[in-house]
Amino acid sequence: MGSKFKIILFCDRPSENQSASTIIDHIDSFKKYSKHEIVVWSKRNALPDNDVLASFDCLIIHYSISLLYERYVSRETLEKIKSFEGLKVLFIQDEYRRVDFACGQINYANIDMVYSCAPIEVARKMYASLNENIILKTTLTGYVPEGICDILLNPTSQRTIDVGYRARKCPFFLGKKGIEKYLIGKYFLDYTNDLNLSSNISS
């Protein structure tokens, strides 16, 4: 394959106005920072024909493409992934959902490497049913955008907001932790009501 690989990045890149800069930055970083040839393939539930796919050395499945749902990966697309003979790498997030099903999909597609957001010891427990030859790695959910690195921040004493927090209501099947994530904001406001804090809480 030589020292420079030809890599196809299978993703669902949002448009710039969809307020998903973290996802966009992560997708764009492959092409921006890799020494290899990166082709960004942003088409939900669609990969190139097998003969085109065969021209690549590596297939990366980005976390914006979920193996859990057919609207992202149909059976036909999964078969293309399975039949791809190069290196297959999966980045996965939201790992609290249908883990056993995800393991089944990963095993079936013969994925070679999985990047999890969990510490490696936890990831090994979560994905215990993966084939033994699959390599597990740990990665971060996101990174600081380059665009804000040079922004000058006010000293803490000059900031108008003491505490900021954002969360959303999660569906019930995400369990206690999903509820607690949302309730933290409400409880914080209740417990600090007499502390004269300037808070910006949305949950």
List each language-model region with its residue ranges.
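Nucleotide-sugar donor-binding catalytic core of glycosyltransferases
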Residues: 2-56, 63-77, 90, 95-101, ...
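Short, conserved SAM-binding segment of the class I
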Residues: 80
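Short beta-strand/loop segments at the ligand-binding rim of alpha/beta enzyme cores
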Residues: 84-89
